[in-house]
Amino acid sequence: MKQFILSCVLSVAAIAPSQAQQANRQLPVYLDQTKPVEQRIDDAISRMTLAEKIRIIHAQSKFSSAGVPRLGFPDFWTDDGPHGVRPDVLWDEWEQAGQTNDSCVAFPALTCLAASWNPQMSRIYGEALGEEALYRGKDMILGPGVNIYRTPLNGRNFEYMGEDPFLASIMVVPYIQGLQSKGVSACVKHYCLNNDEEYRHQVNVIVSDRALHEIYLPAFKAAVEKGKTWGIMGAYNLYKNEHNCHNHWTLNKILKGDWKYDGVVVSDWGGAHDLEQSVKNGLDMEFGTWTDGLTMGATNAYDNYYLSMPYMKAIQEGKFTQKELDDKVRRVLRLFYRTTMNPNRPHGFLCSESHYAAARQIAEEGIVLLQNRNNVLPINTQKAKRVLVVGENAIKMMTVGGGSSSLKVQREISPLDGLKTRLGKDGIEVDYARGYVGDVTGNYNGVTTGQNLEDKRSEAELIAEAVEKAKTADYVIMFGGLNKSVFQDCEGHDRKHYELPYHQDKLIEALAKANRNFVYVNISGNAVAMPWKAKVAGIVQGWFIGSESGEALASILTGDANPSGKLPFTWVNSLKETGAHALNTYPGTWRQEGGASTKGNIIDEEYKEGIYVGYRWTDKERIKPTFAFGHGLSYTQFAISNLRSDKVQMKQDGTITFTVNVKNTGKRAGAETVQLYIHDVKASVDRPQKELKGFQKVYLQPGESKDISITINKEALSFYDEASSSWKAEAGKFEALVGNAADNLKLKKAFELF
């Protein structure tokens, strides 16, 4: 009997492979996971009709595009980021869908992430965001953003990673890798030169090739070549008189030509303007366009999109071949195989404690201690009996508003509540005074905060109450700054002024006079004027840090966490300390009378400062800013010493490694960021005094020391040569400058490139 059973098993086993092989032969190549992806794409394209091809390259709703149901490709869903997954809107309207499962964790704004100077935080950020997106059924997150901080008036700076192309390049890559490791596509934006918001649909940027390649493109290039991003979003603005959603130079020549990008180019919503350019100049997926006279309010307008019926009709009439169409379809199908057709894509989860922990950790590492006179911070919880909290930003929800990054959160802990909880553990009384009234609205696109911030008292009454309470407090902590209302840190418009709004300067000076233990916490994504800096004991840059904002700020202020953030931009004293404003090139010059109200009018904005953005400009002009790029204090002290290199001469195809010793000389555990800048001693072209080319964050216990090494190659020594349209590293003498901020580089090492 046993022998008979064994014979049967062997017979079945012999039959099974042939059946499996037969099944594989019957399986279409485009569904066969054993075949190379490009072969599967070829097969899918060969099976698709013209209508099916057209259908997948434009939107079918506010945030989705069609799949190919006949072949088993599902619909493709995008959603706004980059700080959390935006709540769902109706299929064809911008109103909220009214769902009960589309809350999210709000992660810190990308300025805060950049201020961590820690690529590990970027990876954690991307992974957590990807998991939330998966749970919500999203295939692409519209972010991260890496436009350069050119002017502090840009209403959208809070969504970006600062002024330095090297810092942004290093920080964006792990974010993309973390997000896409979950099978969710990144869509890096806004490519490119979208450096102010006010006239973003009409501004034509005039910039030198050198500045374009050295300042404004490197982070996008890193996103493509190192991050391997699957998506790029075109910007609204024009470059060389072509909109960047269908721009021959930026998309065809640079992105898809020079960088060999194999992903999709997605239009920003309403960013396509021309059929022929949309077809020929690199746009792959069109979203949100208002064409043929249709307005923003038009419904079911998708057939009128340039890459919809107008494109199909033009092909049928012989105006275009299917060559460009098949390239677009190939890229979209490649995206499908990476996301919706990926059988190994994990399951997501939403609002988990691990995600809140990630948000808090990122926030704590990004908060910057700017000033700490007489060691006013951290709050001495052993001696303090009463702490006064002042300011609207101590109680106002900051996750709602700001434009497309507005979120519907499961929870947001305010700074006031965070301090009450933390200080309450030590029996410390926490009092509150409003101090000023700013933006009392709590509604953005149907998402409401549920807060009533109305206060009818006069400015004088509000200040008087705060000052009176401040006189008897052990500490006064004011949470001020900006918010996410229009003309502040908000998409679509720029700030009107560099100064703090709502007469906060007057309140700050009064509080600083009333209590010597006064700490100002600036909540914003931008720098602000600080004419009262010398009168204030402590200054903290608190950013927009999302769901765990109160917890993270309380941890920093009480010393439970040691601040280690560093500024990702130069904090200037006034607008005239930036090239864009010193040279009067912002916001540009209108071509016709009537400005923005004249239909079709274009405003030309010339970046006359060239490569001199941020610290490059202040170095050139010998300006001492309020706070330098890379500046950030700690509750402990560090010594950076003994700079050495593994060689003094470097070949063109070689590398050089610099090593320093970092020691925690204080009494608290903490982290320091070692920054390496390169100075070209003599060059054939004008070069910045120094440029960031390496950094590393190191965590040390009291008394602990470590050697930190940073290796560079000739890329770190190169400039973009306009004559040859290529990067060039000239032989000669260079210096490595090492320290912990752009204005604190005490170590120098000479070397030579030959």
What do the PLM-derived regions correspond to, one by one?
Residues 2-5, 9, 506, 582, ...:
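Acidic/proline-rich low-complexity IDRs
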Residues 17-719, 726-742:
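Glycoside hydrolase catalytic-domain context in secreted enzymes
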Residues 744-754:
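Short beta-strand elements
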